[in-house]
Amino acid sequence: MKNLIYSMIMLFTLSTIAQDGAEIWMSYELKAKDGMSQKFEAAAAKKTKKYNSTAENGIFTFNIMDGENQGMYSRVIGWKNWDFMNSNEDRSEELKYWRDNVDQYVDSSTGWKVWRRVKWASHNWTPETTFDYMLKHTRVIKPGMDQDVNHFLGRLQRVYEKHNYTGVVAVFRIMSGGNTNEYIICEGFNKYGELGEYPDTDKTEEELYNEMFGWESYRKDAKAYNLALEMYSRTTERQHFNAELSTQL
């Protein structure tokens, strides 16, 4: 009975998401065999040019620079919707090419994770957006504490938008393949130390936030946000965009 109830809840959740124009992303990580990174990259680059040359079949790759996954590659598919998930497109030739020409250089890989981009908490994240580097912040929400997290992230986005923040920020929440209380905040940039700025003011982000939402709002909302997160989940890693292993749009 518990399994049946859980299945019904998940079906209702996914059906609701399907109706609201969800923007779907997928990602996984892989590790090249020792001493085989160059051969892997050469083979993967050929595969990318052959099978992933358009926006419809595009894939993006990042080198993970630190943390427990240092040295691995993050492969990402984005800007999709439910039509992509429901597609019956035959990809057997592409998959066979990978098995025959690339997989021999791969030591291990994770399973796919499916994400939904949280548009109302994202800023300057468009198909035309490009950047060389990215900070990936992983967080896990305590059960039942979504409201405090959503409240703070949503208000921050409103500050970004109103005051023309130049940074690139995207928030993604797991839909499948992992803990559904997990989300990531991705910040794209082209130079370390320059994530973004508010060009029209000298005020701090906290001051702008308080102007919009009331005295001490930033401190109060940030405290509630932090208390809503699992302590073990607060990790950040650097990723560098790998153009050779990515679709050139």
Placement of each model-derived feature along the sequence:
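Bacterial Sec-dependent N-terminal signal peptides
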Residues: 1-22
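Short S/T/G/P-rich N-terminal loop/turn motif that feeds into the first structured element of a domain
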Residues: 18-249
